[in-house]
Amino acid sequence: MSRKGPAPKRDVNPDPIYNSKMVTKFINKLMLDGKKGLSQRIFYKALELVGERTNEEPLEVFETAVKNVMPVLEVKARRVGGATYQVPVEVEPNRKQVLAIRWIVNYARERGERAMSERLAGELIDAYNNTGGAIKKKEDTHKMAEANKAFAHYRW
């Protein structure tokens, strides 16, 4: 086992257009097979579509959408005497953002529109309006935590 300790956290550079680190993280999560240029084109096109459809500032819609999807609680498996309990725990700030981005990208990929930029725009608008797959996933996560509230004292 390594004695060096955990690897240092690497910080991402802000994106060139909106100068936002959250946008860079989103683009990286959207990327498949190392094709970052394609990922950027899809994302910026999606934001253009969001701007056209909502008549609001696209970056604000994006940030609000991510904020709306961020979970407050999640469950973690904890073994106690041979039984595994789903223990509700609060989600750390960085993980909130990571989960929100992951859910938005995954549910955008599952949508029915033809182009990925259209799917992503649709999912962002839905998340902005507190509807859609990513919001449902957040609510399901919260329901799981609420249902297992009895095991909260097993928190570590």
From Swiss-Prot:
InterPro entries: Ribosomal_uS7, Ribosomal_uS7_bac/org-type, Ribosomal_uS7_CS, Ribosomal_uS7_dom, Ribosomal_uS7_dom_sf. One of its GO terms (cellular component) is small ribosomal subunit. One of its GO terms (biological process) is translation. SUPFAM superfamilies: Ribosomal protein S7. The keyword tRNA-binding applies. Transmembrane segments: none annotated. One of its GO terms (molecular function) is tRNA binding. CDD domains: uS7_Bacteria. Keywords: Ribonucleoprotein, Ribosomal protein, RNA-binding, rRNA-binding, tRNA-binding. PANTHER family: RIBOSOMAL PROTEIN S7. One of the primary rRNA binding proteins, it binds directly to 16S rRNA where it nucleates assembly of the head domain of the 30S subunit. Is located at the subunit interface close to the decoding center, probably blocks exit of the E-site tRNA. Belongs to the universal ribosomal protein uS7 family. Part of the 30S ribosomal subunit. Contacts proteins S9 and S11. This is Small ribosomal subunit protein uS7. It comes from Natranaerobius thermophilus (strain ATCC BAA-1301 / DSM 18059 / JW/NM-WN-LF). The gene is rpsG.
